[in-house]
Amino acid sequence: MAQDQGEKENPMRELRIRKLCLNICVGESGDRLTRAAKVLEQLTGQTPVFSKARYTVRSFGIRRNEKIAVHCTVRGAKAEEILEKGLKVREYELRKNNFSDTGNFGFGIQEHIDLGIKYDPSIGIYGLDFYVVLGRPGFSITDKKRRTGCIGAKHRISKEEAMRWFQQKYDGIILPGK
């Protein structure tokens, strides 16, 4: 609408990917967890971080502070590249309830080999979760240590804006929620 009148859109309102979080939850510590860490390292080229269980769940055999998952945060061009691979696996289709009210979205894939990683019988096959955090220029004001600020209500990202950005950038299809 603004471009029809010859005006440029405000560059501070432009949406971009702040970070991409990749998560593999194995549910147990040991060999399977270290193999899942190798998968994330192959995919991102970064060293992943182990996550601990918050509390004991006896029915699942999980103890508090036991390492049960592995995750990695990717930023910049590498994040866009990995997200592109993940969306290609999902055929650029997301549900409406994949998007949060704060303008972020997430989805999962069932097999990591769909991302182009060669199958290794010693590692096996793992599914993983993608979570994309969107931002605008100026969002870093909440992250700094000294003189932190709040993001104004007009500058925040809504669910509809995130869905529109996904449709425009990736020619994505948004299916109705369950």
Curated annotation (Swiss-Prot):
Q: How is this protein annotated for GO cellular component? A: cytoplasm; nucleolus; nucleoplasm; ribonucleoprotein complex; ribosome
Q: Which GO terms describe its biological process?
A: negative regulation of proteasomal ubiquitin-dependent protein catabolic process; positive regulation of signal transduction by p53 class mediator; protein localization to nucleus; translation
Superkingdom of source: Eukaryota
What single Pfam family name could you report for this chain, choosing any that match? Ribosomal_L5_C
InterPro entries linked to this entry: Ribosomal_uL5, Ribosomal_uL5_C, Ribosomal_uL5_CS, Ribosomal_uL5_dom_sf, Ribosomal_uL5_N
Which positions bear N-acetylalanine? 2
- Where does the record place the modification N6-acetyllysine? 52, 85
Instruction: Tell me, in one coarse class, where this protein mainly resides.
Output: nucleus
Task: Please tell me which positions the record assigns to the cross-link Glycyl lysine isopeptide (Lys-Gly) (interchain with G-Cter in SUMO2).
Answer: 38, 52, 154
Against PROSITE patterns, the record matches this protein to: RIBOSOMAL_L5
Q: What does this protein do?
A: Component of the ribosome, a large ribonucleoprotein complex responsible for the synthesis of proteins in the cell. The small ribosomal subunit (SSU) binds messenger RNAs (mRNAs) and translates the encoded message by selecting cognate aminoacyl-transfer RNA (tRNA) molecules. The large subunit (LSU) contains the ribosomal catalytic site termed the peptidyl transferase center (PTC), which catalyzes the formation of peptide bonds, thereby polymerizing the amino acids delivered by tRNAs into a polypeptide chain.
| UniProt name for this protein | Large ribosomal subunit protein uL5
Question: What is the source species?
Answer: Pongo abelii
Its ancestry begins with: Eukaryota, Metazoa, Chordata, Craniata, Vertebrata
Gene coding for it:
RPL11
